[in-house]
């Protein structure tokens, strides 16, 4: 059985031939994009990932709130869900977790990231590509401030390198 998601209600035909191909292709990289607040960072990541048409990446979106989830669905996520349970469930099934740095810290993003969400992200065996955000009150030494688009482009380049290794 698969988990119900917003896309099921929005477009019931979604889980047709495309989804069957994704499930059959064991080499398909499962990318979990997690975001909160308005979903702006996550939706920009998904839009950039969707431009990479030659890839067979399966892009899942999980928002800490429905507004973030909706924004990521509009950006083109293949499947989406909302809330703590969705983060915990999907973090264990993803190959890569992509999102703002705050998703790995409890009570970040104005309290939207619960301790269980942060533990699921940090405890997952998935490769984590975290985008530094200066609003998180965490500064990573050696990381120079850059525009969000530069960090997203770097994440996409890293995903291509990882995909080549599969």
Q: Model-predicted segments: where are they?
A:
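Short, small-residue-biased leader/transition segments that mark boundaries at the very start
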Residues: 1-6
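Polybasic, lysine-rich low-complexity intrinsically disordered segments
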Residues: 18-22
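Glycine-rich phosphate/diphosphate-binding loop of Rossmann-like nucleotide-binding domains
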Residues: 30-63
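Short, ordered loop/turn segments at secondary-structure junctions
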Residues: 36-39, 64-66, 85, 103, ...
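A short helix->loop->beta-strand "cap" motif at the edges of active sites that frequently abuts
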Residues: 56, 123-128
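N-terminal beta-loop-helix "entrance" segment that forms/cooperates
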Residues: 57-82, 139-142
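Glycine-rich phosphate-binding loop
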Residues: 79-117
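Short, glycine-/small-residue-rich phosphate/pyrophosphate-handling segment
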Residues: 130-166
